[in-house]
Amino acid sequence: MEKFTKLTGIAAPMPLVNIDTDMIIPKQFLKTIKRSGLGVNLFDEMRYDRQGNENPDFVLNKPQYRDAQILVTGENFGCGSSREHAPWALLDFGIRCVIAPSFADIFYNNCFKNGILPIALPQEEVDKLMDDAARGANATVTVDLENQTISGPDGGTISFEVDAFKKHCLLNGLDDIGLSLEKVASIDAFEAQASAARPWV
């Protein structure tokens, strides 16, 4: 998993509430177990019309937001079914950070396991960042995980909270497999001890 330390990039404003995982990546695209290739179908039903043409009014289709790495959105983001394809699609598109007033719990935890930083902020601070994001490519936002700060184009800084263990995992690029590999020596020692104590098992 790619480390997340400091990210400076374009923030895309999506002022919608209750964006569920089916809106993030519709069910017809869940047939794969690969993490790559899902970005093209991110927000599929909002990005494209029935003929498959891009909707020019959708934020991520606008030229100034096509390379967005940060998404600023409304409360309860990621609600609905617990599909891990949702963070996979965001990451494959290029989104490394999602900022919202609140998140669905399972989606929130899945983000950390896939290299995405979800940040929950008070509504007024999200509104400020939404206004900043409306400036498009002329306004970059910096998210500093180590110092737990967000810096806007006007130089203002917002602090955010994050669980210490989840922060450690993102800073070091550790997913569940990476965490297990860190403990290989301890696991081997335990298995050897258990085998010696109970050779009949």
Swiss-Prot record:
Which reaction(s) does the protein catalyse, per the Swiss-Prot or TrEMBL entry?
(2R,3S)-3-isopropylmalate = (2S)-2-isopropylmalate
GO BP term, pick one: L-leucine biosynthetic process
Q: Which GO terms describe its cellular component?
A: 3-isopropylmalate dehydratase complex
Under the heading InterPro entries, the entry gives: 3-IsopropMal_deHydase_ssu, Aconitase/3IPM_dehydase_swvl, AconitaseA/IPMdHydase_ssu_swvl, IPMI_Swivel, LeuD
Pathway in which the depicted protein is active = Amino-acid biosynthesis; L-leucine biosynthesis; L-leucine from 3-methyl-2-oxobutanoate: step 2/4
Q: Which Gene3D superfamilies match?
A: Aconitase, domain 4
- Which class of enzymes does this protein belong to? lyase
User: Is Amino-acid biosynthesis tagged as a keyword?
Assistant: yes
The answer to whether the entry has keyword Aminoacyl-tRNA synthetase is no
Recorded hits in SUPFAM superfamilies, A to Z, give: LeuD/IlvD-like (SSF52016)
Source domain of life: Bacteria
Drop me one GO molecular function for this one. 3-isopropylmalate dehydratase activity
Q: What is its EC number?
A: 4.2.1.33
Which UniProt keywords are given for this protein, alphabetically ordered? Answer: Amino-acid biosynthesis, Branched-chain amino acid biosynthesis, Leucine biosynthesis, Lyase
Q: How does it assemble?
A: Heterodimer of LeuC and LeuD.
Would you identify the family this protein belongs to, as annotated?
Answer: Belongs to the LeuD family. LeuD type 1 subfamily.
Q: Quote the function comment for this protein.
A: Catalyzes the isomerization between 2-isopropylmalate and 3-isopropylmalate, via the formation of 2-isopropylmaleate.
Protein name per its UniProtKB record: 3-isopropylmalate dehydratase small subunit
Q: Which organism is it from?
A: Dinoroseobacter shibae (strain DSM 16493 / NCIMB 14021 / DFL 12)
